[in-house]
Amino acid sequence: MEGDWEQLGLTLLNTDDDNNIVLFSSTDELSDFRNRLDAYEGPTPAGQKNPSYSGFINRIGSISTLEPRDRLGIRIKEAGFTEVSDLQDGQEYILDVELWEFGTQAARRRKAEEIIAFIEEQGGELYDHYSGPSITMIRVKASGQSIRPIFSVPEVAFIDLPPEPDIEANQIVQFALDDVPPVAPLDPDLPIIAVLDTGVNDHPFLADAIVAREAFPSELGEADIAGHGTAVAGVAALGDLRSQLDGTSLQRVARIISAKVVTDERKFFDRRTLPSQMRQTIQSLNASHGCRIFVISLGDTKANFEQGRVGPWATTLDELARELNVLIFVSAGNRPPRGGTSVEQGVTQYPGYLRGGRRNSDQLLRWIV
């Protein structure tokens, strides 16, 4: 049916599991579409059993325009906002404004700049403007009265609170150095893996394997206060440590770049959109260190509820993987009840988690490069 919409000058923007679709028209008049409706409602042509275009029109349940409240994102709705009017005058909000993927990238950028100009005229502040191949998003700090009109802009897809990382570090297992095999000398030709996380602390197993410590942006610092990034770096550098404890030495399988992208308070940096932060980090490390393997063990608990679409974070990673010819590994399925802490779960449960009973399982698979 998408071909039918294209013939009418309509662009398919979004679908969901309830068979609702969002279309964008290049003209306000919708002349071609209205002509088909008029023909359908008119007399049945001679020699035909059914009205004109009945095969097309009968598949449509109802037609309506998007309302401002339809643009409320999942996070802001879960925060208790059910109507645009819930955004209060005099109250400031930090919000992500995402545009539909309409027209050209330049056209989307111009529309974003118009929205930015309006918000700034109302006393709001621009935090970030990301204009990528598919995703166009701005992050603003604005009052209720200055952001409410943006919910009525047709080109706006969603307005939402910024995402938050789902970080849970496992309990630390302590070993005395005398109780584990010695660390084997590091092979200088080992591949480099960039760990985009909470930072990486000093550790005797990792000390000579750390190629660089960087933060994006730099004001995040380098220390791993949460402890999550250090654990992820250990897995990247050593694999399954348990399998090596009975050996004669600990073998590293990779060198590590620590790329800190999370604050010490376990939040994403509030002055950057996630697409902007991911693109800056991955492009920079690829250019400066030739890094082609990236690990992102940071979840977004709301990503499963992106309303029938691939979200901006996943889309940006897909684009970067293609543009730079890099591998990006993203954790999935390692939350209760599937903890992913045993090898058996990877065989017996994880494949079903990806494939079984989910109409949007292809979206999950897009995260695995």
Feature-to-residue mapping (PLM):
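Short loop/turn segments at strand-loop or loop-helix junctions that form parts
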Residues: 90-92, 96-102, 196-198, 258-264, ...
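Aromatic/histidine-rich interaction motifs
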Residues: 130-143
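Catalytic cores of nucleotide-enabled group-transfer and carboxylate-activating enzymes in metabolic
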Residues: 140, 146-161, 175-180, 184-186, ...
